[in-house]
């Protein structure tokens, strides 16, 4: 699959039937390592690969409380959650957030290429970041905060090219 095929086939997958193999997970992580980071400050981002079902369950529960929805399942019973954390202190721009989002998108596109299900996770990550006890369980390096993440795993869903409507995002041209 070429890059544009992966981009046009990408979708949020929320149904999983197993964990990625070690080789698949390493490929997904390699895509993260290939992501651009502002001013090449790679020491300002950190990945946490969580496959501990108990911890994923705690994050899911924190999100239920955060959204005041006891029926919510924002982690979708995923076997793996990859959290991207960053150093936010001392910044007054959006570079740390952009770095993390770019890292996640690279991992998602690699997952598409591998036929793995993947989905950006924002809400549960926000809930996690507001829960000091859960953040402590992550053993993040000093000064790092959870920013965004993705879930990934085996799926029976198939990626096929989607019709991408032009004009979906308002676009202005300045000549």
Residue ranges and their predicted role:
Residues 32, 82, 88-134:
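Small-aliphatic-rich amphipathic alpha-helix that forms the alpha element of a beta-alpha
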Residues 1-80, 174-175:
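N-terminal amphipathic, basic helical "cap/leader" segment at the start of enzyme domains
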Residues 3-12, 17, 21, 140, ...:
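C-terminal helix-cap and adjacent tail motif
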Residues 60-64, 132-137:
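Short, surface-exposed loop/helix-turn segments at secondary-structure junctions
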Residues 80, 114, 146-148:
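Generic beta-strand structural signal
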Residues 39-42, 73-76, 138-144, 163-165:
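Solvent-exposed alpha-helices and their adjacent loops that cap or buttress functional pockets
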Residues 52-57, 88-90, 156:
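Short, charged/polar surface micro-motifs in flexible loops or helix N-caps
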């Amino acid at each position: 699959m070429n890059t544009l095929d992966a981009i046009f086939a990408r979708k949020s997958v929320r149904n999983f039937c197993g964990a990625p193999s070690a080789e698949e997970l390493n490929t997904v992580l390699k895509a993260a390592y290939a992501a651009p980071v502002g001013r090449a400050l790679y020491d300002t981002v950190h990945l946490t690969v969580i496959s501990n079902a108990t911890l994923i369950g705690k994050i899911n529960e924190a999100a239920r409380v955060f959204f005041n929805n006891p029926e919510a399942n924002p982690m979708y019973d995923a076997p793996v959650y990859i959290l991207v954390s960053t150093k936010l202190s001392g910044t007054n721009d959006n570079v740390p957030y952009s770095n993390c989002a770019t890292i996640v998108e690279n991992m998602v596109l690699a997952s598409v290429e591998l036929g793995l299900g993947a989905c950006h996770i924002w809400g549960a990550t926000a809930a996690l970041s507001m829960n000091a006890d859960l953040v402590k369980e992550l053993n993040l390096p000093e000064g790092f905060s959870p920013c965004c993440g993705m879930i990934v795993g085996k799926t029976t869903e198939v990626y096929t090219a989607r019709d991408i409507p032009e004009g979906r995002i308002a676009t202005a041209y300045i000549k």
